[in-house]
Amino acid sequence: MQQAPSGYSYPMATTVLPAHAVANLMGNDVAAVLTATDIVMGQLTAELRGARAGDVVDLVASNGAVLQFTIAKVVPDEISGGTELLLSIEAAERLGVTRESRMVLWGFDSRASLDAELIRQNLISTSIRVRRSWDPPDPDATLGMAQTKAALGEFAYRVNTNGSVSIDSTWKNANISAGSIGQLSLRSGCHNLVRAALTNAMNEVIASGLEYTINYFHANTAGGCYVPRFNRLTPNSSIGFLSRHTWGQAVDTNTVGSCQGCAPPDMDCRTVRIFRKHGFAWGGNFLTPDGMHFEWVGKRRDVGLYPSRYCGNTNAGSLAALDGESERSTIFADDGLYVGDH
């Protein structure tokens, strides 16, 4: 049994879809087991905690009530789209989740015609995220929650009355270390794996004569790495999104010229590609540009051409060969995390 400390919960990425959408996207066998009390769990998430079909999961509703659900089926992540928990509309309503935040399209005859209609309806913009299962691998795609937990560990957290977030001390003490990396002070700390990659990236930036492109003053005053934060879905709700900074997974540097929303960001593209080389996605190509943000993904990302808005890769090797996953297998992986958070 996995039990969070009293007053704490484990963050779980959750996707809610109607039965007919699940049937078309994941198969009738998956749709058939979803009920108001039965849910589906992704395979990676199940492996991380030794869960299996028939186990019971306690989920915290928007009003704070704890409700029980049964794992009816464990499915491969390439089937579930990378989410941790898949719920029916009826199960979500029990939890107080009713806001619609996604439209899923399938069964169309022509991809080109679909894209043309999206453009005609003014749906291709920086305010609407459009993902296609056939898109090429994006070098600035981030890790889903299950992948993040597998790489950086899973913690229990508590949202305090003032909106701040407390993380269980066992995980924090084992994974978060403070101390500078060169002129980056990182006073609040950073995940140990991220620190190692950040050290290598900064060493190459300096060796390439590009240290001047990093604004240390901004990084050390308004930036940071380990900064636990929670974005509530609605006021006073226990349901919301954790920032990736809660894992000590990302670092912010040039917070003025490459601020969230600044377009184009002023970050030097040579520095961006060095960070990608050492396993960081860059926020400059998020839906809302966040050019100050470098987020650890643990895999080289400077390989493979992609139509990035800013700072595209110049190395034409195959990113797909490095990542070994498709857009289809990660289409719901960002659920539960605040995408584009700085």
Regions found by a protein language model. Name each.
Residues 18, 88, 190, 194-201, ...:
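Stable alpha-helical elements in mature extracytoplasmic
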